[in-house]
Amino acid sequence: MAKTQRLDIVTPEKVVFSEEIDFVVAPGADGELGILPEHAPLVTALKVGTLRVQQGGKFFKVAVSGGFMEVKNSRIVVLADTAERADQIDVERAKAAKQRAEQRLNSKGSEIDVHRAEIALHKAINRIKAAE
């Protein structure tokens, strides 16, 4: 039987996922990281992106919006600001959020927080891509 590792994806609101998996690719702050069972211990920041998880020969995606990942003793803990399985993403809601962020960025008002609007746009695009 193939070796597996535990993956726990946790947000401030809930445990999104907590099961044995085969492999995960995570959006590390310095690039993507592939984690197999018995990986060397590691702690890294995560950027907005998509976790790609292989479990039992099948793949699924989880959209994350930053956080941290710890790998130790064939256990992976992802502490994410937000996390949403691709099959649970409301694509229409994500598209609406993308449109709102684009409208904010295109407006010329001084009350617009450009950095915040850019982050919102990036998160919305990530959710849409993860759901595809």
Curated annotation (Swiss-Prot):
Q: Organism source for this protein?
A: Desulforamulus reducens (strain ATCC BAA-1160 / DSM 100696 / MI-1)
The encoding gene is atpC
What name does the UniProt record give this protein? Answer: ATP synthase epsilon chain
Q: What is its main location?
A: membrane
Pfam families linked:
ATP-synt_DE, ATP-synt_DE_N
Q: What does this protein do?
A: Produces ATP from ADP in the presence of a proton gradient across the membrane.
GO molecular function: any one?
ATP binding
The cross-references to CDD domains, in alphabetical order and at most eight, read: F1-ATPase_delta (cd12152)
Q: Where in the cell is it found?
A: Cell membrane
